[in-house]
Amino acid sequence: MKFGFIAHPTSLGLKRYVKMLDLLQRNSTEQHSGYTRELWERQNLVPFMNFARITSATGATCEGVIKYMPLVADEMLADARGIAARVVQGIEELAGDGAELVGLGGFTSIVGRRGEATAEKSPVPVTSGNSLTTYAGYKALMQIQSWLEIRPEEEPVAIVGYPGSICLALSRLLLAHGFSLHLLHRAGNHDRSELLSHLPEEYHSRVTLTSDPEDLYPRCKLFAAATSAGGVIDPARLQPGSIFIDVALPRDIASETRPARDDILIIDGGCVTATDAVKLGGESLNVTIKQQLNGCMAETIVLALENRRENFSLGRYLAPEKVLEIGEIAERHGFFAYPLASYGERIDRQSVTNLKRYYHHDIYAGESADAALPASRLAFIDAVIAQTPAREDTLDRYHQYINPMMVDFLKLQRCDNVFRSAAGTQLYDDAGEAFLDMVAGYGCLNLGHNPQPVVNALKNYLDAQGPNFIQYISIPEQTAKLAEVLCRLAPGNMGRVFFSNSGTEAVEAAMKIAKASTGKPGIAYLRNSYHGKTLGALSITGRDKHRRYFTPLLDAMVEVPFGDLAALREALNREDVGALMIEPIQGEGGVHIPPAGYLQAVQQLCRETGVLLMVDEVQTGLGRTGKLFACEWDGIEPDVLMLSKSLSGGLIPIGATLCRADLWQKAYGTADRFLVHSSTYGGGNLASVVALSALREILAQDLVGHAERMGAYFKQALSEIAARYPFVSEVRGRGLMLGIQFDQAFTGAVNASAREFATRLPGDWHTTWKFLPDPVQAHLRAAMDRMEQALGEMFCMKFVTKLCQDHKILTFITANSSTVIRIQPPLIISKAEIDRFVGAFATVCEELSTFLD
């Protein structure tokens, strides 16, 4: 059976989209078949899409064609009678092309008395599609009720657009389900008895009527709307936690773009999505129009699949049983109201449950009107602490209160894990499944998760009620011990230590030492380096992706190409440069080892020019590379040295900046200056106790030697696998600080795709390209180049995904390069665990080796 469907654009932007398609389609036809006057004549309907064959989940088939009437709602309402005639003309055109049923989208049914008047003049049956649209809105509301865990009697629903056909049918379904309703009707219609007459009398006690939207805002947080006017509800007036289901077009929320509020949710109701079992004509590369299909169009398709040549969904009264019937038939054929969407973007359970706190004041009492009462706040905190949240609840909280983009990114990569416990090299999720951790907090966990000797040292100090934050009213004993140990262990002539809480703070302290001791504002740094994300550290981080949003940064910072001694000599001879910041291995830059002899030459240049040599060992230090300090591989003796990450065994934040005593004296050795740099939490006894224990265990367990031996074995094993696959270009690093460089080339792929389409599609698109303006061509070429780069990054992330999903191994990319996977396991890793990773890596390489070039 063949159907036709008449759609229309619902916004000016969509109208111009249809205009663009029409222009391109006619131009393509002209280039392919030649010019004719008829081709460029005014058309009643604009061709949009032909479905040569639709196959449903049951195996039923149909075919159809969709055309647009190129008018928005306001234009149609301005000439309702004339548009009604054009709709009938359009139906006749479709019937002439073989359509046996025609669906009327949006206003194309409204202008014909919801299809009734149109049906009287139509040569074939018609449907407004409003029954399936209603069903989709109903199912969306039922899903939201379930996710919010509320009962119908607990939360009233506002129905906006009563007694329109969709709102009337939806009201009857919701009342039958137990909801109370606030019905918003058009102003001027105040006959209460007439308005209530559309509903069974048994429901009247659960219904209120109003023509003023202001009455709804304080009463309701759940809304469903389907008016013919649109723009009825002001999103700024909605209560926090409100969920607004815009069931039909035009939008009834007064905003064509998503409102800038994160405490409400606007849902595109009335839409359905086809499952994978449904085939909508020819499909290639899983590219087909299947998601968020308007219910009116989907109803037309479903009726055609059923071979039902009958008028359907006409007039004001849509029988609830017919609504449920068409919904059940649609689901049988593979069309469902899920997933939900907001302004075209898919949303999931988490988007709804983020608002749950606005509905459960018994649990979230601290956010209720009684939040000012101490007892209420205490009850809230106690309730949160007592919870053992499910994984989804934790994702919801993080999404709501910390970083929604991070949650969405990890979900996209199938790496949205939530772990409950950790020990050694293993992390355990709430199902008790173990994951091998090859990231180790980006170098924080050299001793593994919760190293018992360090945990014991922490417990013992707390059990003894040892003092912690006393460093500004007395001298902290444990911190003094730690400073001595660090100065004795570190290379160079270290004599002073400043303690902080992180690597980037340690870098900030080093920069201040350099400025204060030399009197020079400038610091040289290396391209592709990474030293942290505070403003000072960013100023000497050699990667624009981290810096561009925070400019202007510090002046007088000088970037030098990595490995270029001539450029470095020029920079160090500048009058305003007093220090050079380097990493022994560029970790976040992609695990790059300097060229042989480079670091010794760098040190010599610093000595010749009198420039301070500052070495960032935040990630490379404390055994990671097979030496206690990575700079020892090259015999480097820094003037300033930075440590953090594994200094406390990953248990307590700590950073340390070591320097020569004479530098400290120049910077801070006067009555006015000895306290000009400080940190509230830096230098506390508790962190120092833990750090002393961590340092002892690194040495006692010979993790430095273990890292050297296991790292050499690991690198060799990975390199042998990499040699078999051209998309793994290099395995590099030292000790247990390794990086796997991927190079799955997509250069030219997007360009080839564009040329292929230009060649195969009707018309002369190559000539069209020639006459695009130069700036347009330049932007398109740049977009194609970046897209090809993104495809390579996507391929690399598939390794992260597959290692996690298929092998329960955690890895991640480096901060500066999305085509390098970091391998930084705890230094306690066993040979068997390394072999497990090597085997998994080999398997993933083989599985992703469809293309070898």
Curated annotation (Swiss-Prot):
InterPro entries on file: Aminotrans_3, Aminotrans_3_PPA_site, Class-III_PLP-dep_AT, NAD(P)-bd_dom_sf, PyrdxlP-dep_Trfase, PyrdxlP-dep_Trfase_major, PyrdxlP-dep_Trfase_small
Binding site for pyridoxal 5'-phosphate: 503-504, 680
Pfam families the UniProt entry points to: Aminotran_3
Cofactor(s) required for function per UniProt: pyridoxal 5'-phosphate
Gene Ontology molecular function, alphabetical: identical protein binding; pyridoxal binding; pyridoxal phosphate binding; transaminase activity
Top EC class for this record: transferase
Keywords: Aminotransferase, Antibiotic biosynthesis, Pyridoxal phosphate, Transferase
Pathway assigned to this chain's UniProt record: Antibiotic biosynthesis; prodigiosin biosynthesis
Top-rank taxon, per record: Bacteria
Residue numbers carrying N6-(pyridoxal phosphate)lysine: 645
Presence of keyword Transferase: yes
GO process annotations (BP): antibiotic biosynthetic process
EC number: 2.6.1.-
Function: Involved in the biosynthesis of 2-methyl-3-n-amyl-pyrrole (MAP), one of the terminal products involved in the biosynthesis of the red antibiotic prodigiosin (Pig). Catalyzes the transamination to the aldehyde group of 3-acetyloctanal, resulting in an aminoketone, which spontaneously cyclizes to yield the dihydro form of MAP (H2MAP).
Quaternary structure annotation from Swiss-Prot or TrEMBL: Homodimer.
Protein family per UniProt: Belongs to the class-III pyridoxal-phosphate-dependent aminotransferase family.
Descriptive protein name: Aminotransferase PigE
Native organism: Serratia sp. (strain FS14)
Taxon lineage: Bacteria, Pseudomonadati, Pseudomonadota, Gammaproteobacteria, Enterobacterales
Gene: pigE
